[in-house]
Swiss-Prot record:
EC class (word): hydrolase
Species for this entry: Homo sapiens
Residues bearing the modification Phosphoserine: 83, 103
UniProt feature, compositional bias: Basic residues: 65-75
Name recorded for this polypeptide: ATP-dependent RNA helicase DDX51
GO molecular function, one term: ATP hydrolysis activity
One GO term describing the cellular component: membrane
Gene: DDX51
Family membership: Belongs to the DEAD box helicase family. DDX51/DBP6 subfamily.
Keywords: Acetylation, ATP-binding, Helicase, Hydrolase, Nucleotide-binding, Nucleus, Phosphoprotein, Ribosome biogenesis, RNA-binding, rRNA processing
Motif annotated as Q motif, chain positions: 221-229
Skewed-composition ranges (Low complexity): 10-28, 49-58
Pfam families: DEAD, Helicase_C
Record-level GO BP terms: rRNA processing
Ranges of residues in domain Helicase ATP-binding: 243-452
């Protein structure tokens, strides 16, 4: 760093009075005082900023190298430094040389001794024009930190901590932001034994339907039915051709435990809304994931439409396409005549009829009911819903201005969109494990939806994870949960002990694959003493229907199944559900154990867990809000009497598997 003093000519009088020697001595004294003041300030700032570095520098000074700036070699003329003949540029200084002693006077117009080399006649960087006689303090202050005085005060450089020093801290949990209809549902009571509502308390139900209910032994509604039936009847209060007040009714979503009466909650209002129809058209369409469940729902519709002119058609692929076409449409001289008011179908078969059945029309569709909605959403890759919606809003003659009830796609509610009334399409979603993920529900295109949910499901909204499945499922009140720690080899022995020693008459056992189900069936059959059957896709629809009927009648004691029967199948009298293979997902467990403790009855669920599965499974159920699981340990002494017959059955199982492989190869 070089401090300089610009000697300006003060005038002839002042120069004559002071003389050349006095002026030069005064300039040197002022420059020295300014330099000392800047050096002291630099030391104070350095000590305030890095007190620890100065101590570390003193201790590590011999081991560290001092950084020095690269020096430039400059050509020095023979003229003395400080004389008017000296060249422009910086002067080299010896190490440890005092800057104040070497600061010298420069001529006006020459660059300062601490600045970079510039063209002759240009002002030095960082300085500004000043009045004659004033010192360029701003330029000196800017140049001060770069000089040797600051280097001496700073001392040697000490390496510091660049990365690290971060403490472990748990990330805050982000609360999901849900739409209002999901965050504030219509809460439904979940106790189906104490919160019953008498039939007379809902007078809007048609007297003929009330008579049908009493004839089948129903004198009270379950809480879900008491909440959903009035809401659906209100949306069809002005008839099924137009919505209430001419507006499109809201879509409904119902999330309630298994066995809480969801099927009857939509059967009663749909049948009542269509009682006034004159011409037969497809007004209600029920879409379900499995053939067995579709057959069960079709049976309920047939019961309550028996004394009415309404007709129900089942379309699941159990019959040939031609047979199903005969139950849907009839060809006449004037065209095609519809033969069904209510159609119960599976997605794949429904799309087949939309594409291949002449005269099959959904243009008069009023109710679209999606049961087991969470599984139906997972099968949206089949694109069945867009096909149904496109068929429902397809117009025969879009250019006809006289079509008063011409169906159009739903738009924003404006004066123009409501001036011409049209028959609305109302969507109804039902499931025990209805997802609350807005991204998935958006695929359904719901219109101003309303959610009916149990209190437990509403509580779980705050604990919804990325899939939208955690902490929001409700279990039947009368269900008792158990888990049995065991090894992989002792699993069949545990199942045999539960069936033979504990005296359960109807046991439903679930496995994760069709192969595991078949092998366990062969093993129990070889063991003997148990009426066992297998329920899987190995059998056709007729055989599966016969097996379920025998199981309900008590002719089959143990039914080994895959998850095919875990979805909505209402099997009467199931006392015990055994999870032979622990379910991987929460909603799979909910549907499995929901086959027992239905309609207010009691039931038990046992899950066989390996040691590596216990922690994850228990945490999953705890987050779901399930009641406390009871640990049920079986000692080797209890299973020892079954071991001899079990070993014989294993040898027979091996032979049976070999024979089946030979048959497949042949």
């Amino acid at each position: 760093m070089a401090l300089f003093y610009v000697a300006r000519y003060p005038g002839p009088d002042a120069a004559a009075a002071a003389g050349p020697e006095g002026a030069e001595a005064g300039a040197h004294g002022r420059a020295r005082a300014l330099l000392e003041r800047l050096q002291s300030r630099a030391r104070e700032r350095q000590q305030q900023r890095e007190p620890a570095q100065t101590e570390a520098a003193a201790s590590t000074e011999p081991a560290t190298r001092r950084r020095r700036r690269p020096r430039r070699r400059r050509r020095v003329n023979d003229a003395e430094p400080g004389s008017p003949e000296a060249p422009q540029g910086k002067r080299r200084k010896a190490d440890g040389e005092d800057a104040g002693a070497e600061s010298n006077e420069e001529a006006p117009g020459e660059p300062s001794a601490g600045s970079s080399e510039e063209a002759p006649g240009e002002p030095s960087a960082g300085s500004s024009e000043e009045a004659p006689g004033e010192r360029s303090t701003s330029a000196s202050a800017e140049a001060a930190p770069d000089g040797p005085a600051l280097e001496e005060a700073a001392g040697p450089l000490v390496p510091g901590l660049v990365l690290g020093g971060f403490g472990k801290r748990k990330a805050p949990k982000v609360q999901p932001f849900l739409p209002r209809w999901l965050a504030e549902p219509n809460c439904v009571r979940r106790n189906v034994t104490e919160d019953l509502v008498p039939i007379e308390d809902i007078p809007d139900v048609h007297p003929d339907l009330q008579k049908q209910l009493r004839a089948h032994g129903i004198s009270s509604y379950f809480p879900v039915q008491a909440a959903v039936i009035p809401a659906l009847l209100e949306s069809a209060a002005c008839g099924f051709l137009v919505g209430r007040g001419g507006y499109r009714p809201s879509d409904l979503c119902v999330s309630a435990p298994t066995g809480s009466g969801k099927t009857l909650a939509f059967v009663i209002p749909v049948v009542q809304a269509l009682l006034s129809r004159v011409v037969c058209h497809i007004r209600a369409l029920v879409v379900l994931p499995t053939k067995e469940l579709a057959q069960q729902v079709s049976k309920v519709f047939n019961i309550y439409t028996d004394a009415t002119p309404l007709r129900v058609s089942l379309v699941t692929g159990q019959k040939s396409l031609a047979k199903e076409q005969e139950s849907l449409v009839q060809k006449t001289a004037d065209g095609y005549r519809c033969l069904a008011d209510i159609v119960v179908a599976t997605p794949g078969r429904l799309v087949d009829h939309i594409d291949q059945t002449p005269g099959f029309s959904l243009q008069q569709l009023r109710f679209l009911i999606i049961d087991e909605a969470d599984r139906m959403i997972d099968s949206m890759h089949q694109s069945w819903l867009p096909r149904v919606v496109a068929a429902a809003f397809q117009s025969e003659d879009p250019a006809d201005p006289c079509a008063l009830l011409q169906r159009r796609q739903a738009q924003a509610v404006t004066a123009a969109s409501t001036c011409c009334p049209q028959m609305p399409l109302q969507k109804l979603l039902f499931s025990a494990t209805l997802t609350q993920n807005p991204e998935k529900l958006q695929q359904l295109g719901l219109h101003q939806p309303r959610l009916f949910s149990t209190g437990l499901a509403h509580r779980g909204l705050e604990d919804t994870d990325g899939d939208g499945d955690s902490g929001k499922y409700a279990f039947p009140v009368g269900l008792t949960h158990h888990y049995v720690p065991c090894s992989l080899s002792s699993k069949p022995l545990v199942v045999l002990h539960l069936v033979l020693e504990m005296g359960f008459s109807r046991v439903l056992c679930f496995t994760n694959s069709r192969e595991n189900s078949h092998r366990l069936f062969l093993l129990v059959q070889a063991f003997g003493g148990v009426d066992v059957a297998e329920f899987s896709s190995r059998y056709g629809p007729g055989q599966r229907r016969m097996i379920l009927k025998q199981f309900e009648q008590g002719k089959i004691q143990l039914l080994i199944s895959t998850d095919a029967t875990a979805r909505g199948i209402d099997v009467q009298g199931v006392e015990l559900v055994v999870n032979y293979d622990a379910p991987q997902y929460l909603r799979t467990y909910v549907h499995r154990v929901g086959r027992t403790a239905r309609a207010g009855k009691t039931g038990q669920a046992f899950t066989l867990l390996l040691k590596v599965q216990e922690r994850r499974f228990l945490r999953m159920l705890t987050e779901a809000g399930a009641p406390e699981l009871q640990r049920h340990e079986l000692s080797s002494k209890l299973l020892q009497p079954l071991v001899p017959r079990y070993e014989e059955a294993l040898s027979q199982l091996e032979e049976s598997v070999k024979e089946e492989r030979k048959q497949r190869a042949a």
